[in-house]
Amino acid sequence: MNLMKGGKADVAFVVDPDVDRLAMICEDGVMYGEEYTLVTVADYVLKHTPGNTVSNLSSTRALRDVTRKYGMEYNASAVGEVNVVTKMKATNAVIGGEGNGGVIYPASHYGRDALVGIALFLSHLAHEGKKVSELRATYPPYFIAKNRVDLTPEIDVDAILAKVKDIYKNEEINDIDGVKIDFADKWVHLRKSNTEPII
């Protein structure tokens, strides 16, 4: 990131080893935010191809906001690429993915693909004529904290989640994967890990 501060590059792309997740670094060395990878490319896609969008429940609300800006429908899926793809097919989504930098663009294929994400991001950047940091500033500035709670065998997680649902029954609740509570200006998502004893 310090290399970016020298002013010789407009953007840096960071991918994982199997190139299915994408993060960016702005020209000033600040992380763009992997939660905003999908949001940004969806903005570009929706500008040129009206349609629905999908992300998993744990992703930023910003995709919903951008989708509604175009008068389209946002849908949430359970966490996991296969769940996102299933919901995308069911809702004829034109773009989808996850807040971990995963972009799924059906016009290319139904799989997370960082190279497709890079191409869409660069196209959007060129059309907007902005610096990367300026483009990032155009999206809702949601703060996301991802915390984990280690569980012990005697903890009844399902009972805890049921109690949370009951306490917040007057709020918008989605329980397709744990419990997500949507408030007017924030949200919280509690879910059990499928691979570790954590929430």
Report the location of each language-model feature.
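N-terminal small/polar loop signature for handling phosphorylated ligands or for N-terminal nucleophile
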Residues: 1-25
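Phosphate-binding and adjacent anionic-ligand microenvironments
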Residues: 11, 49-198
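Short secondary-structure boundary/capping elements
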Residues: 5, 33-37, 182
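Short, acidic/small-residue loops that bind anionic groups at enzyme active sites
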Residues: 31-48, 52, 78-80
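Short Gly/Thr/Asp-enriched flexible loops that form oxyanion-binding sites at enzyme active sites
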Residues: 20-38, 64
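Short, contiguous, pocket-lining structural segments
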Residues: 14-16, 30, 37, 58-59
